[in-house]
Amino acid sequence: MCFPLPSNSFKTMTDLDYMRRAIALAKQGLGWTNPNPLVGCVIVKNGEIVAEGYHEKIGGWHAERNAVLHCKEDLSGATAYVTLEPCCHHGRTPPCSDLLIERGIKKVFIGSSDPNPLVAGRGANQLRQAGVEVVEGLLKEECDALNPIFFHYIQTKRPYVLMKYAMTADGKIATGSGESKWITGESARARVQQTRHQYSAIMVGVDTVLADNPMLNSRMPNAKQPVRIVCDSQLRTPLDCQLVQTAKEYRTVIATVSDDLQKIEQFRPLGVDVLVCKARNKRVDLQDLLQKLGEMQIDSLLLEGGSSLNFSALESGIVNRVHCYIAPKLVGGKQAKTPIGGEGIQQIDQAVKLKLKSTELIGEDILLDYVVISPL
């Protein structure tokens, strides 16, 4: 859509600046577009921005359409900067490539290629065949960073998994007595609420439910609420816990291997979906669970489990990203739990290998953002 812009305010902007503006616009859709990608679009004519837009929500207009259709300017001869290759197929909305051609756009800068099999280079090729000059790969790394969830889901049909945990400077997620509220400060906890808004689902193990009785909702104002998932192999989740009692308000799923129909039927009238999965060592097979969640169009999963579930997730090879919050506190104690439990590994060369993407100071706490490059 068109936003009021000061006269001549962007006269000295470069191609890189325009694409950075498109990236900033795309980020405004965080949490609302899943399972669609984040996309921003800026249209420039005679050195000035005349239209801009972003994909605001699932089912809504795409970025290019938002920019073009809310603008009354003649766009003939203009240049478009789009963070993701324009679509060329009919989905919930008509093709964006057709619209850019119809409005006389003469040049299009594209940040990321779209791996969606329905697009996958066809959008750029259609523009070229219509005589539009296409430049691909402008700020590709930054544009790619907008959509790790979309890229993963569209190619695997499984959720992108982010493991999140908070620990003290000596690597403890709780004291020896089990107390964990609160390890991090308010600012870090507020960031977690934003992350919950951005992910389609959040998962904990039944031990976390029994110990903390969590709600697992996003407390950010006007947030989109994630699907709440409990990994509970033997259906030990109490019927009177907060997750079950609020299941009609917030979608709640229990993943289990139990075939106890009497137990299963106790949850259904309360609004809980019980998902029976394959068993692996008498526990939920997390690979099978991810397959089922993908079929439910859940494109992303925030894992806020305890040490046992965290290790199981790593052992199953489902984790794509890790957010490690470190608080400036020391608690010690041999019995105090660490973020990753389970049996662990026996040899260092078998360790899960991570790549550090960023380090951020949030209040007094540190957030380390890693991607998994070598799973177990």
From Swiss-Prot:
Residues annotated as domain CMP/dCMP-type deaminase: 13-135
Pathway: Cofactor biosynthesis; riboflavin biosynthesis; 5-amino-6-(D-ribitylamino)uracil from GTP: step 2/4; Cofactor biosynthesis; riboflavin biosynthesis; 5-amino-6-(D-ribitylamino)uracil from GTP: step 3/4
Co-factor(s): Zn(2+)
EC number: 3.5.4.26, 1.1.1.193
Catalytic activity: 2,5-diamino-6-hydroxy-4-(5-phosphoribosylamino)-pyrimidine + H2O + H(+) = 5-amino-6-(5-phospho-D-ribosylamino)uracil + NH4(+); 5-amino-6-(5-phospho-D-ribitylamino)uracil + NADP(+) = 5-amino-6-(5-phospho-D-ribosylamino)uracil + NADPH + H(+)
Binding-site list for Zn(2+): 62, 87, 96
Active site: 64
Keyword Nuclease in record: no
Lineage top rank: taxon: Bacteria
PROSITE patterns: CYT_DCMP_DEAMINASES_1, CYT_DCMP_DEAMINASES_2
Keyword annotations from UniProtKB, A to Z: Hydrolase, Metal-binding, Multifunctional enzyme, NADP, Oxidoreductase, Riboflavin biosynthesis, Zinc
Entry's Gene Ontology BP terms: riboflavin biosynthetic process
GO molecular function, one term: NADP binding
Pfam families linked: dCMP_cyt_deam_1 (PF00383), RibD_C (PF01872)
Organism: Actinobacillus pleuropneumoniae
InterPro entries in the cross-refs: APOBEC/CMP_deaminase_Zn-bd, CMP_dCMP_dom, Cytidine_deaminase-like, DHFR-like_dom_sf, Eubact_RibD, RibD_C, RibDG_C, Riboflavin_Biosynth_HTPR
Binding locations of NADP(+): 166, 182, 208, 212, 233, 306-312
Region (Reductase): 158-376
UniProt entry tagged with the keyword NADP: yes
Protein name: Riboflavin biosynthesis protein RibD
Gene3D superfamilies per record: Cytidine Deaminase, domain 2, Dihydrofolate Reductase, subunit A
Gene: ribD
